[in-house]
Amino acid sequence: MFIMKRYLATLCLATTCTIVLAQSRSELMSREKIQKNKIASVSQWTHKFNKDKVDPKGYVTVVTNYDKNGNEVEIINYKQNGSVSSRHTYKYDNQNRKIEYLQYQDYRQKGIELAFRQVFTYDKNGNKASELGFDGRTTYRIAYSYFPNGKQKEIIRYNAANQVEEKWIYEHNGNNTKISIFKPVGTLSKITERKYDSAGNLLDEKNTSGDGKELARTVFTYNANNLPISKSEYYAGELRASYSYVYDGQNQLIETYLIKPNNTRLLYSSYKYDGQGNIVEEKWYEDNATDYSHRNYKLDSKGIVDEVDTYYSDYNFRVVYRYEYKF
């Protein structure tokens, strides 16, 4: 198992992000484990603390339903009063590729309404070919094209009037890739340059503005097992932070250190595992917090998570998540 948070940047042309104080499926169990154990549904109960004691009542905060392949098909988030705050539905093809995502939100005085929609298609090689979407205000379309060798060629975003809003043009030269981003079309707004090693690991990513000024740069190094052992982040040409990663004999990440430009070294996160590779303890540092946040996991004999005792140091908030399963 390899766990790394706050790691690689992802390409986002149209996304929305929500931060919740809860556990995602990927943090609890892999799709393969859900499929193997034939889990059909998981209900997350939230139990707050009353002084130093866990409130035994609790309330349901998330219900996640799965298909027979272990894919999430529905996630319902609940408010403390039991009403629905949001609903997310997913559809997949026979290769477990996501083909539709719908997000419904509870808007005050409006009730539950569609807030976000994505529909995906794929080409004969399994590459994403198109995305049709609704971002809460208007519709959009994203078209993806590829070179004969399968490498990305272009990504083009169209607005509701079918006008080009944004274009990403890829140039590949050996292990190097250059991405020219035009937004609006005709105006070069950013250039991203990536360098990879022979194993396909990202070594260097540099972002510059259209007029050539360096915006940000990230540099990685790897061990013999192709696991990252360091990451250095630069902004406007200056080193802002470095991270080093430590693994155990099973290639499981056990520690992440933050090294500041003044060479101050801080334990940024740590992980402990049981004999089957299941994570049982996680600690991480929040900026300006006086203590580490943590999660302690209780598992059953099959490695399925029963309970997570969680403390968020930046909020000084402790909570226990308990899980009920339907098979």
Which role fits each region the language model picked out?
Residues 1-26:
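Bacterial Sec-dependent N-terminal signal peptides
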Residues 23-327:
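Buried hydrophobic residues that stabilize the cores of well-folded domains
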